A protein has these predicted regions:
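Extended substrate/RNA-proximal surfaces in nucleic-acid metabolism proteins
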Residues: 48-122
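Histidine-centered catalytic micro-motifs
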Residues: 4-15, 38-41
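Hydrophobic "anchor" residues on beta-strands that sit immediately upstream
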Residues: 2-4, 35-36, 70
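Glycine-rich anion/phosphate-binding loops
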Residues: 16-20, 110-113
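Divalent metal-coordination and catalytic microenvironments
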Residues: 8, 28, 40, 69, ...
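Alpha-helical scaffold segments that flank or form the walls of functional sites
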Residues: 22-36, 56-62
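Histidine/acidic-residue-rich catalytic or RNA/ligand-binding cores of hydrolases
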Residues: 15-19, 47-51
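Conserved beta-strand edge residues that scaffold enzyme active sites
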Residues: 42-43, 76
């Protein structure tokens, strides 16, 4: 199988990864990726990026080492209502937005409640 993209990655800016953006792009290019999505955590995860980080992404090149980059966020779903920890103004500045439930900032619910939260977030 030939994998051409990875759209859910973190750099050291997320607080729990160990590579820089340039290191990630170089490694992706070496593996033959054509597209790499960098999706740092938003503020619901302790120790991660400040909103200013996302607002400044416009200065970062969208191509490095021959690989295209999409820069964005892994936005936290905070509850079963689908509340997100990023506002619309911030989200509009991103190339890519993914969302997830993380127990560090989400009160665990039933499968039905969690599913409802995911659907509401969409």
């Amino acid at each position: 199988m030939n994998i051409e993209l990875d759209m859910h990655t973190h750099t050291l800016a997320s607080g729990h990864a160990y590579s820089t953006l340039q290191e990630m792009a170089r490694a992706g290019a070496e593996k033959g990726l054509k597209l790499l999505g960098i999706t740092e955590h938003t503020s619901g995860i302790p120790g991660t990026c400040d909103p200013i980080y996302f607002r400044n992404l416009h200065v970062v090149p969208r191509r490095m080492y021959g690989i295209d980059l999409m820069l964005g966020a892994e936005i936290n779903i905070l509850d079963s209502k689908g509340t997100l920890d990023a506002d619309e103004a911030l989200m509009k500045k991103l190339d890519i937005r993914i969302a997830g439930i993380h127990l560090l900032c989400y009160e665990h619910g039933t499968v039905e409640e969690n599913t409802h939260g995911m659907i509401q977030a969409i």
